[in-house]
């Protein structure tokens, strides 16, 4: 294996420190009485996996020597934990069904590696000095839907959903910036079936989203560039890992469709619409 122009040996035909282990737990419960239905689901997934030392961090042949244990996990390694909690609530009347979903997710990923840097001015962190990268993404989601069957041939569906995300970071290195993201949308869909051969449907939806990305700079890179003789304009350009962004988006989508089934062997579909997708 060649890493950063250095040939890294593989002893005993085994990639050292590539073992891993994981644990998962799931829980689900449901309750139903007459027109009311409810459920709750909880899951948690954890994984820890080692990285081959010969392809991560500063090349060091001494770290590749066999330690006699093919299952241990040493630096460098990654840890990932995903927690998910969701609940579904529904109540049905004679001609109307109302349902809602609420959810929460936490995605936490960390990468650990012996502290290393490209710049001599970057000090060893006082807390968790070997934590290279960490991402903590929290997601909250909500949706509500209504279905109304006013007549046997006419059906209406309404919906509203929202989601909020927040990502925070830590560690002595950088990969992704901190950000907040909010999205929401409302929709209406109607379907008319005068008989078993014809179906006409139409709908409209409006979506809105806001993205806020936090700025992140590298002062140690800026110092290095200044020492190398770069002018202030170049230093200011390269020092930022991410720039501050605060943008909002919103637009509508609509569609109209017809399905005609004159016989068991023939079916004609016609659809026309306009779509918008949040970035």
What positions do the PLM features span?
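Structural signature of Gram-negative outer-membrane beta-barrels, strongest in the C-terminal barrel
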Residues: 151-163, 171-279
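Membrane-embedded beta-strand positions of outer-membrane beta-barrel proteins
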Residues: 1, 29, 40-42, 100-102, ...
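Transmembrane beta-strands of outer-membrane beta-barrel pores
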Residues: 3-5, 33-35, 44-48, 93-95, ...
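Short acidic, glycine/proline-rich loop/turn micro-motifs
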Residues: 7-13, 112-114, 168-174, 213-216
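Transmembrane beta-barrel wall of Gram-negative outer-membrane proteins
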Residues: 1-3, 12-52, 77-93, 97, ...
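Hydrophobic, lipid-facing positions within transmembrane beta-strands of outer-membrane proteins
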Residues: 23-27, 81-87, 138-144, 182-188, ...
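Short hydrophobic/aromatic-rich motifs at helix boundaries and adjacent loops
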Residues: 1, 57-61, 108-117, 156-162, ...
């Amino acid at each position: 294996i060649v890493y950063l122009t250095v040939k890294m040996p593989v002893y005993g035909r085994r990639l050292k420190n590539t073992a891993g282990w994981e644990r998962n737990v799931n829980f689900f419960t449901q309750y139903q009485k007459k027109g009311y239905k409810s459920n709750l689901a909880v899951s948690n997934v954890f994984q820890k996996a080692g990285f081959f030392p010969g392809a991560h961090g500063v090349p060091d042949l001494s770290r590749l020597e066999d330690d006699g244990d093919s299952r241990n996990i040493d630096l460098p390694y990654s840890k990932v934990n995903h927690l998910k909690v969701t609940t579904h609530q529904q109540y049905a009347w004679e001609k109307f069904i109302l349902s809602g979903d609420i959810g929460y997710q936490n995605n936490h990923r960390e990468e650990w590696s012996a502290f290393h840097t490209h710049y001599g001015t970057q000090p060893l962190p006082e807390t968790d000095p070997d934590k290279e990268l960490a991402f903590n993404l929290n997601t909250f989601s909500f949706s509500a839907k209504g279905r109304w069957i006013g007549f046997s041939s006419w059906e209406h569906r309404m919906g509203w959903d929202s989601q909020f995300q927040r990502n925070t970071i830590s560690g002595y290195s950088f990969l992704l910036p901190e950000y907040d993201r909010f999205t929401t949308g409302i929709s209406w869909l109607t379907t008319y079936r005068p008989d078993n051969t014809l179906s006409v449907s139409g709908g409209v939806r409006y979506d809105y989203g806001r993205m806020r990305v936090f700025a992140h700079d590298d002062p140690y890179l800026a110092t290095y560039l200044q020492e190398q003789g770069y002018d202030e304009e170049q230093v200011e350009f390269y020092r930022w890992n991410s720039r501050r962004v605060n943008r909002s988006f919103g637009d509508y989508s609509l569609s109209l469709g017809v399905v005609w089934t004159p016989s068991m062997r023939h079916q004609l579909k016609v659809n026309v619409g306009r779509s918008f997708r949040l970035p």
